[in-house]
Amino acid sequence: MAKEPTRVRRRERKNIVSGVAHVNASFNNTMITITDAQGNTISWSSAGAMGFKGSRKSTPYAAQVAAEDAGRKAAEHGMRTLEVEVSGPGSGRESALRALQAAGFTVTSIRDVTSIPHNGCRPRKRRRV
């Protein structure tokens, strides 16, 4: 019995001019998601998805490569201007932002949306090296 050939789904080209780049820079990884104004994901990338493993994922260079990849995918959909929302304490915050600007996007605003607890959960124990 022959299997049906699996059909490859091609991504249709959306024509979106402006969007929001969400940069989530944690201590272990940096994730970049580019959405339209309503919050629908247009493109995404992360340091881990770009082939970095372990402690190399948390480097600024890995964040730069991930931002360039997400920006290239978003530019295929016609995106030109971005608002950037940065969250998290990681080292890839500034380098991801610079990579998006170097990719040819016009950055209209930069917002830090890192959540700060009003004495919520107990923090993890101190590292002793």
From Swiss-Prot:
GO terms for molecular function: rRNA binding; structural constituent of ribosome. GO terms for cellular component: ribonucleoprotein complex; ribosome. InterPro entries: Ribosomal_uS11, Ribosomal_uS11_bac-type, Ribosomal_uS11_CS, Ribosomal_uS11_sf. Gene3D superfamilies: Ribosomal protein S11. One of its GO terms (biological process) is translation. Keywords: Ribonucleoprotein, Ribosomal protein, RNA-binding, rRNA-binding. The keyword Cell inner membrane does not apply. PROSITE patterns: RIBOSOMAL_S11. NCBIfam families: PRK05309.1 (NF003698), uS11_bact (TIGR03632). Belongs to the universal ribosomal protein uS11 family. Located on the platform of the 30S subunit, it bridges several disparate RNA helices of the 16S rRNA. Forms part of the Shine-Dalgarno cleft in the 70S ribosome. Part of the 30S ribosomal subunit. Interacts with proteins S7 and S18. Binds to IF-3. This is Small ribosomal subunit protein uS11. It comes from Methylorubrum populi (strain ATCC BAA-705 / NCIMB 13946 / BJ001). The lineage of its organism: Bacteria, Pseudomonadati, Pseudomonadota, Alphaproteobacteria, Hyphomicrobiales. The gene is rpsK.
